[in-house]
């Protein structure tokens, strides 16, 4: 309850009453609004690469109880079992852990606020996000500047093989494709093929 009211309206993952379908409909609305190019970014091994100091800095902006902050720090550093041996964790957030979804949203809210400050329409579901612009040239510039922000400010890695600039009609997000000028929502061909 402390953080969620402050999160962006464009953030959908791991939040109450904000489903993947809501995110997909938001993408459709943005494309229909005239944003014809998208920057589709994938963060490489997001949960494994979360920097503890950056997450703790973000959390401490709203949480001032030192005991709670220490507990969250311990959660992040709890370690993982590798072949029966406990290995300490210097970075990353335990995948499947109860706090990890919230901590990921707290960290990526930094990105959301930056995109809002720049006036860029976007949709983010957990660590999967798309940014929308009007031209290919703008999309290329936004890709480069957001990649810099993610790398320098959040100390995360953009997976360049899975990230791209492309025309928004025809793009795919969360397993759905947006077809034609009306951005009609269809199951993405890859997902349909996998289902068969």
Language-model regions: role of each:
Residues 6-172:
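Conserved polymerase palm-domain catalytic core
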Residues 182-196:
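Basic, alpha-helical interaction scaffolds
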Residues 179:
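Polyanion-binding surface elements
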